[in-house]
Amino acid sequence: MNHVSRRGDGEILWLGGHEHGRPVEILVEPRTTGTRAFTMGAQNLPPGGHVPTHRHPYEEILFVYQGRARITVDGVPHEVGPETAVFVPPDVYHSIENVGEAELRLTFTLSPPGYENVFRELARAGNDHPRVPA
């Protein structure tokens, strides 16, 4: 079992296809660390990049450590910068948008584990999260 996971060592999954999609890196999950409580990963978004509005039955903590983001949770937009955590309750619509001029770097932690398998299925199919009608 791994106890230390560094960026670049995790499983990289391309959501939306490799050419025009966005990479998500899975760093901590049951398969590699034996965790039973959560999955943790990271992603970078270029200026203007976004994660579409979606929901899932998992609690999620987003932690921005570089850049500026608009994270919308349950219809309420929150402008956040470095060193900011955002909690997303289960089954609540949310999205992420890089509103800064630099790359947005963030981590996500989902509890319980399992959403890493959704990421794998989306990547295998060349899809991103399904878009939600406005």
Model-found features: residue ranges?
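Short acidic-glycine-tyrosine-enriched beta hairpin
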Residues: G75-D91
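A short hydrophobic beta-strand segment most commonly corresponding to one strand
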Residues: F87, E101-V118
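Conserved GNAT-family N-acetyltransferase fold
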Residues: Q43, L62, V86
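Tight coil/turn sites that cap or link beta-strands
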Residues: P46-G48, E83, D91, E101
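Conserved short histidine dyad/triad with adjacent acidic residue
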Residues: I26-E29, G41-H56
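Glycine- and acidic-residue-biased ligand/ion/polar-headgroup-sensing regions
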Residues: E59-A69, D74
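A short, N-terminal "cap"/entry segment at the start of jelly-roll beta-barrel domains
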Residues: M1-A37, E121-A134
